[in-house]
């Protein structure tokens, strides 16, 4: 989860987020070299006393400043397109969960199980927090998903626009009334991950957290059995 004075991403817990972090580093590396080159040229130009006012055009220079930017754009576009296709890929899921946004809480429906189950997830008030709980992030009912499994999340809203977001997994999906948006993800690491509604949805928008536990498959099966009782 996020820390105080943090300027970087949260630790990546899904293949998608790992690719996004790699692309971020790749882009910043290119931008660093471009900025360094421009700064060097500006300094050399401002400090140099050599000038030539007779040069009106140069085919060689025009070719260079056309080819090099095109090459840089290709270096940025190829990994970006790969990630876009990865985000839209819908593989055969192991489990499907329907997420519905409300003002101002979430509901999760497990409809493809032998017995349909549903949980409501509200933020815990500050007065109900225990030692070690996180203010404005803890909920009364956490959603659990199995580790190393393909999860398909169907996301919609009952009232206004919301956005279901888990930064550590690189997920941000709009919850739109009357429409189902979907996303697939998986996590290779167990743990507790937090997110929040990322679309302004009213007075209590800031009090609409998301808490997801990634647990081993056997533990998830036990959790589902208890949920169905």
UniProtKB/Swiss-Prot annotation:
The protein's name in its UniProt record: Cytochrome c oxidase subunit 2
Family: Belongs to the cytochrome c oxidase subunit 2 family.
InterPro entries: CcO_II (IPR045187), CcO_II-like_C (IPR002429), CcO_II_C (IPR034210), Copper_CuA (IPR001505), Cupredoxin (IPR008972), Cyt_c_oxidase_su2 (IPR014222), Cyt_c_oxidase_su2_TM_dom (IPR011759), Cyt_c_oxidase_su2_TM_sf (IPR036257)
Entry superkingdom: Eukaryota
Species this chain originates from: Myxine glutinosa
EC numbers: 7.1.1.9
Cofactor: Cu cation
Upper taxonomic lineage: Eukaryota, Metazoa, Chordata, Craniata, Vertebrata
Subcellular location: Mitochondrion inner membrane
Oligomeric and partner information: Component of the cytochrome c oxidase (complex IV, CIV), a multisubunit enzyme composed of 14 subunits. The complex is composed of a catalytic core of 3 subunits MT-CO1, MT-CO2 and MT-CO3, encoded in the mitochondrial DNA, and 11 supernumerary subunits COX4I, COX5A, COX5B, COX6A, COX6B, COX6C, COX7A, COX7B, COX7C, COX8 and NDUFA4, which are encoded in the nuclear genome.
Pfam family, any one: COX2
Enzymatic reactions: 4 Fe(II)-[cytochrome c] + O2 + 8 H(+)(in) = 4 Fe(III)-[cytochrome c] + 2 H2O + 4 H(+)(out)
Broadest EC class assigned to this enzyme: translocase
The keyword Metal-binding appears for this protein: yes
Mitochondrial intermembrane domain ranges by topology: 1-14, 88-229
CDD domains named in the record: CcO_II_C
Function (record text): Component of the cytochrome c oxidase, the last enzyme in the mitochondrial electron transport chain which drives oxidative phosphorylation. The respiratory chain contains 3 multisubunit complexes succinate dehydrogenase (complex II, CII), ubiquinol-cytochrome c oxidoreductase (cytochrome b-c1 complex, complex III, CIII) and cytochrome c oxidase (complex IV, CIV), that cooperate to transfer electrons derived from NADH and succinate to molecular oxygen, creating an electrochemical gradient over the inner membrane that drives transmembrane transport and the ATP synthase.
GO BP terms: ATP synthesis coupled electron transport
Residues noted as binding Cu cation A1 in the record, renumbered to the chain: 162, 197, 201, 208
